[in-house]
């Protein structure tokens, strides 16, 4: 299965502002959270967990958030790839898993999902 990557969304602050507008979450709250979680670095990775990206989403939280809210923000093609396994964990088959998880490094996707 081929999944189209979403192009880079521009500056981090601009992405957070757009996410604030689209989700209704306070811009300053999202900015402070991004500063605290990643020092505004969209490529941040935690050394001791799967937490990654601007808002340091761990894998399961990211997958669940994209599954629940992705479609209403233009990420439906990714949300459709996510399913809940028999053990209750969120899963994505094959190489599409990395594509979905790598959205955590896209400032727009991460900011929008953080707003949810």
Language-model segments: which ranges?
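Surface-exposed patches in mature extracellular/periplasmic domains of secreted proteins
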Residues: 28-32, 43-46, 73-79
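Secretory-pathway/luminal and periplasmic proteins that interact with or process carbohydrate-rich
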Residues: 38-45, 64
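Export/targeting segments at the very N-terminus of extracytoplasmic proteins
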Residues: 1-40, 104-116
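An amphipathic alpha-helix signature
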Residues: 13, 59, 63-66
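Alpha-helical segment that forms one wall of the substrate-binding/catalytic cleft
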Residues: 63-116
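Peptidoglycan cell-wall recognition and remodeling modules
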Residues: 42-54
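Structural recognition of the beta-strand scaffold that forms the well-ordered cores
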Residues: 32, 53-56
